[in-house]
């Protein structure tokens, strides 16, 4: 059991929560429109030999929004992670990512393998890609979504319970899990509550890699990697696994009960897999499911 209270911290534009005081660091990266509370359920089970850092990605949770003239491109999250590690003077770390956070994690590990001690991907692998024939449509949709946002006003909800119930329904998670995510993503408003999330997060991306580009960017990941899939998870993730498993030299697959947020639904089961992977005998680690 963890002996440490969770600390709220900020460095530069990045807010994060941390617990533990070990020599090695574990970085946790959440999914799209989630926040660092995504990993708080792990805290009671975490090994105290590590320093655990759950990061709020830009535009999420308590981290700063991008500047008014910027947009949220996937590749920028990878660079943001590098910037955070540099600011925090973390030379090497274990990385755990969920959903979009998993995709950020595997691309970072591909680009900066010497900084990554181990990799755990939860309900996410590879990079979301598009057909080259969809390039123009992708661009037009991105421009249209920007125009639409200019004409809209941020929605105000009567209370946090209303927003929690809505998130529970949309994400198919319990009210308790939804409340944990919503609490960190909202702020008071004179007429109720409002999301802290940057509305630009919902913009269509103006650019996506083709599948061949995505595979090229990820090919040859040498970091020992654990992929955790949910038994009732997204079918898209299973397809992504089939597409991208060849990019990893050492990839092991485990399945646990639950839906897309299985790590929050079954935190002890999930964390035990993570801990075993981080403490693995490197010489015994082999590729599975190739």
Located regions from the model:
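Gly/Ala-rich beta-loop-alpha elbow adjacent to hydrolase catalytic centers
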Residues: 97-101, 105
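Conserved alpha/beta-hydrolase catalytic His-Asp/Glu region
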Residues: 152-208
